[in-house]
């Protein structure tokens, strides 16, 4: 697995923990990396994604809500909600990652961690957000 893909996976796991446990960011980071042998570049990118996504939730969540027809954020599967958050953060703030790569990486996470419909769900919402932001 490529380093950036692994970083996204780690960031998703931390976002999931933050969403479920409602624990502080510093505690999640400390507990997550404890006893993990991870290359520094993987860890640094994962932390950047995690911290950046959390910092921008006030702008990310309403954006997702506007494009998730008939879906309330609270009713979404926790994993799908956090894949969307991560994907939107990358779409909007990762200037070195092409939008198609951001969307594809999020869809792959959905296929790996979500249910059989997650990939299509994630793809549809992220694609709509991307098209709207570049219209």
Spans of model-derived segments:
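N-terminal interaction/assembly modules
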Residues: 1-135
């Amino acid at each position: 697995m490529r380093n950036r893909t692994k970083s996204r996976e780690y960031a998703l796991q931390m976002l999931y923990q933050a969403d479920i446990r409602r624990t502080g960011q510093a505690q999640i980071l400390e507990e997550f990396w404890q006893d993990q042998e991870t290359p520094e570049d993987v860890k640094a990118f994962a932390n950047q994604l995690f911290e950046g996504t959390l910092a921008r939730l006030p702008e990310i969540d309403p954006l997702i809500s506007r494009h998730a027809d008939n879906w309330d954020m609270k009713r979404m599967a926790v994993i799908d909600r956090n894949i969307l958050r991560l994907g939107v953060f990358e779409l909007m703030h990762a200037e070195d990652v092409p939008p198609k790569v951001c969307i594809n990486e999020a869809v792959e996470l959905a296929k790996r961690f979500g249910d059989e419909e997650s990939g299509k769900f994630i793809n549809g919402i992220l694609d709509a957000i991307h098209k709207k932001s570049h219209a």
